[in-house]
Amino acid sequence: MLMPKRVKHRKVQRGRMKGKATRGNFLAYGDYGIQALTCGWITSNQIESARIAINRYIKRGGKLWIKIFPDKPVTEKPAETRMGSGKGSPEYWVAVVKPGRVLFELSGVPEETAREAMRLASHKLPVKTKFVSKRDFEEMGGEE
């Protein structure tokens, strides 16, 4: 499971998800990837589950990059606890994802294999996604 080794602040505020991703919104390493279409929190368990789904499908062929990291702690209070008496303890970590963010990248496999692997991974994630390739960004005249 992904989580920071150490953090400056143990508990953080929830915040708001506004606008589109301005960083990490194009393919930097691989030839194919999945890009978020909606905003949301992706937990470290969901990232790990998607990673396993991709790796099981590509079976040792190709290389996978995880482009998001869960660096935000989410606190929870125990069940059946009255309100008050401070903020709960950190229970799990999430990555804040905005529309346009590339979540996973893949290279070294045929496009059909990559497309199916990314489809399997997208079912494990709480945000809507789309399959993207290097060719898509070259046609748009994107940042490269």
Swiss-Prot record:
Keyword tRNA-binding recorded: yes
Top-level taxon of origin: Bacteria
Family matches, as CDD domains: Ribosomal_L16_L10e
SUPFAM superfamilies (UniProt xref): Ribosomal protein L16p/L10e (SSF54686)
One Pfam family recorded for the sequence: Ribosomal_L16
UniProt KW keywords: Ribonucleoprotein, Ribosomal protein, RNA-binding, rRNA-binding, tRNA-binding
GO biological process assignments: translation
InterPro entries hit by this protein: Ribosomal_uL16 (IPR047873), Ribosomal_uL16_bact-type (IPR000114), Ribosomal_uL16_CS (IPR020798), Ribosomal_uL16_dom (IPR016180), Ribosomal_uL16_sf (IPR036920)
An example Gene Ontology CC term for this record: cytosolic large ribosomal subunit
Coiled-coil zones: none
Keyword Acetylation among UniProt keywords: no
Any one GO MF annotation of this record: structural constituent of ribosome
PANTHER family (alphabetical): 50S/60S RIBOSOMAL PROTEIN L16, LARGE RIBOSOMAL SUBUNIT PROTEIN UL16M
Function, as annotated: Binds 23S rRNA and is also seen to make contacts with the A and possibly P site tRNAs.
Family designation: Belongs to the universal ribosomal protein uL16 family.
Assembly notes: Part of the 50S ribosomal subunit.
The protein's name in its UniProt record: Large ribosomal subunit protein uL16
Organism of origin: Clostridium beijerinckii (strain ATCC 51743 / NCIMB 8052) (Clostridium acetobutylicum)
Lineage: Bacteria, Bacillati, Bacillota, Clostridia, Eubacteriales
Gene name tied to this protein: rplP
